[in-house]
């Protein structure tokens, strides 16, 4: 089992990030809970994590800013006494006709998804190397896995596709250091926008539950998964079939 069980999860105040945080806390991990503006929700998540006997605390940062992302990682590592797992969950979503996307909207989606993942991961790598083992799990998107065009969400798909390529490239470079990097790609999740529109189109006819996603994250975090890296695990109920 891991010698160091210390995890930073970005965007972990609510939704998928919250579920991942509580799952890791239930498995004996100390957790740093990141939020940008949802302080009240982050505190609630922290209280729930503490019930598992984990060490837990909240940290505020805008990880689209590289300096803030670096400070977040440093504070997380200092507060936890090290860092071995990073889950990059943060990322905004935009649904707009491609030809009508503004420059500002484009930049926001790329920054909050692809760039934030890069900033946090780059800052975390020295700490994972110090721990002598590490797990990097980045959240993708089912459509991005096969580079499928999806109407009205072009910037989001491009950002998530970039995350997949970045993760694969990084994985190849760091595997000899006992650090793996993988992607979990959800499709429609129980808290997704416009569920009624998406569900009839899914072979499963239902969204993914949070436990189904957290189990996928744990699959990669698990120390027994040390020989699995650069992979994308789609949790989509057959989205791409």
Spans of model-derived segments:
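Conserved glycine-rich cofactor-binding loop
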Residues: 13-14
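The beta1-alpha1 cofactor-binding region of Rossmann-like NAD(H)/NADP(H)-dependent oxidoreductases
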Residues: 39, 60-72, 103, 211
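C-terminal substrate-recognition "lid" of short-chain dehydrogenase/reductases
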Residues: 80, 209-240
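Substrate-binding pocket helix/loop in short-chain dehydrogenase/reductase
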Residues: 97-98, 102-110, 198
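Active-site helix of classical SDR
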Residues: 121, 159, 167
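Alpha-helical segment proximal to the catalytic Tyr-Lys
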Residues: 126, 172-173, 226
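Short, small/polar-rich loop/turn modules that mediate ligand/substrate recognition or access, typified
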Residues: 175, 180, 228-230
